[in-house]
Structures are given as structure tokens and as C-alpha cells.
Amino acid sequence: MRKTRVFVAFLLVFSIFNEVSHASDTIPLQCMNKKTYFLRVSNVIKGCEKSEVSLGAGAIPRSLVRPTELDKQLMYRFKAAQAAAKKDSQIIYIVSGYRTLSRQKTLFANAVRKYGSVAEASKWVAPPLISHHPWGTAIDVNYPDEPVGAGWLEVNGYKFGLCRVFENEWWHFEPVIAPGWKCPALVPDATYSLN
């Protein structure tokens, strides 16, 4: 009886492991060529080649330590998107990415003066401790003069794991999904980061 239970337990563990490893074979992974910035699809088991860099298999979370530059994986995702946009005769570029906490404080203070209250300013400039710019996980694209390229990124950004997040900021993008996933619905403004 005991041998039967051990054997059944072994079969159960083996079948679970087999399912997990098989499922990993089907999880797509976007790999960007370091020279051309073009993408190739692999999977999380095979990974990327030495001449490539992974765009990641998930959203890019905040670092545990406050960074001093734009998140490297976010930059890879943007460069891949930029190369694809160029193939479609569109130009996209980062106007603002990583900001120091001090810079975000200054921008927020200026917005409070401009809009007359913290609540109103927060709709346009996230408070320093809420904003994703000081964490290197947000970019502003083509602002203020070229919304067409940013529109291309809004339509195609999901392929690279980049999503527009605020209805009132056509220029603001964040890596909130894995490349290829569907972007979440837009929220009205930056105050929704506070909720």
C-alpha cells in the first residue's frame, strides 16, 4: 500500500513538473538584436541569443533601490519600438525619462503654483513619491509638438510592453505589461496613481 502511495505521489509530481516545463516552452519572450534593435520571438526556456537582449516576460517593477537612470530594460523596449516606428516612417523619441526626486519635486511645486492646488496639479504632474519617473520606469515621448509618433506608440506599444496610461497625457508611457500583452484601460489622469 505504501509503495502504491509513493508511486502515485511520484507520478503526480512528475506530471506537474512536466506540465510546468511544457507551459514554459510556450511563454513567448521578445528578444531584441543589440545592433539592429529588431525583434525575434523566442520562449522563456530557450531565451535570447548572445547578440540579443530580452525585453522581459512581465511588467517592469520598481527597483528596491532608487535608481540614477532610466531602467535598462525600459530603454531596450523603447529602442525596439523606435526601430519598428522608423520602419513605419514614424519618429518617436524620449523627451523625459528618469528624473531625480529633486527634479520631480520642482516640477510638482511648479504645477501647484500653475494649477492653484495640490489636487489639480496632481492631475498633470504626479507627486514626487508617487511618480514613476524618479524610479526610471516612465517615459514622456514626443512632447509637446509631435503627437503623431506618440500615437503610433499608443497603438503599437503593447508589442514592446509599453503602454500609455493617462487619458490626459498622450505623451506618457510606462512598462506596465509584458511585451505582447494587452495594455490596460487608460485612467483619467495622474491622480489615479494615488488610489
Region roles according to the model:
Residues 1-7:
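Bacterial N-terminal signal peptides that target proteins for export
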Residues 7-8, 22:
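Intrinsically disordered and other compositionally biased segments
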Residues 8-15:
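Bacterial N-terminal signal peptides
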Residues 18-97, 101-195:
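Extracytoplasmic cell-surface/polysaccharide-interacting catalytic and binding patches
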